[in-house]
Amino acid sequence: MRSSVRSALALAVSVAFLPVVTVVTHAHFKLLEPASWLLEDDRGDPQKAGPCGGSNTDWGKPSYAVTKAVGGSKLHLKVQETIYHPGHYRVALAVNSPAELPPDPKATTTDSDRGPRSVSAEIQNPVQVPVLADGLFVHSAKADAPFETDVTLPNIACKRCTLQVIQFMEQHAVNNPGMFTYHHCAVVEIAPDSKKPIDAAWPKER
């Protein structure tokens, strides 16, 4: 009997002094449509680095996927959030180089014991070139189903446009790289619609 009591006490003491493990949750998403330009794992990684994904240790492997579309038409967008975090999405388009993509959304932050923490971000309304849509899929609860919508493409000629889809995360600590944003891109070949005027606000393909 005494042996059993001593064993129980020893177990209780050992459990009491086990290290406390803090779980840090990071939001992640997969770009389902159009096809991502990188091969993504089940969580959508690598996706932290801007403007188009990768990380400090893994810049990703190309998928060589190219989505064909008609200028002035709608392109279907579908993303799956694999790890929940509140926030919203933005879509932008670069004609000649990913360098044409806009900076990540400017964040409002608050101080925490672990450094800056995101509160919100600027949302363009109305959007300006090269942003196609902003403030998409605003959510503050976990969603099991994919987020889907259509975005209207400019009527331009573009053999290898870069379509960028990013997620801004609220209530999130700073990531390195990427700060408060996760990034995915797709290569889109756009053929202009001859029945519509060319969108002069967009850069010409070089």
Regions found by a protein language model. Name each.
Residues 20-27:
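Sec/Tat signal peptide C-region and signal peptidase I cleavage site
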Residues 2-11:
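Bacterial N-terminal signal peptides that target proteins for export
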Residues 28-206:
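Structured recognition/catalytic domains enriched at protein termini
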Residues 10-20:
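Bacterial N-terminal signal peptides
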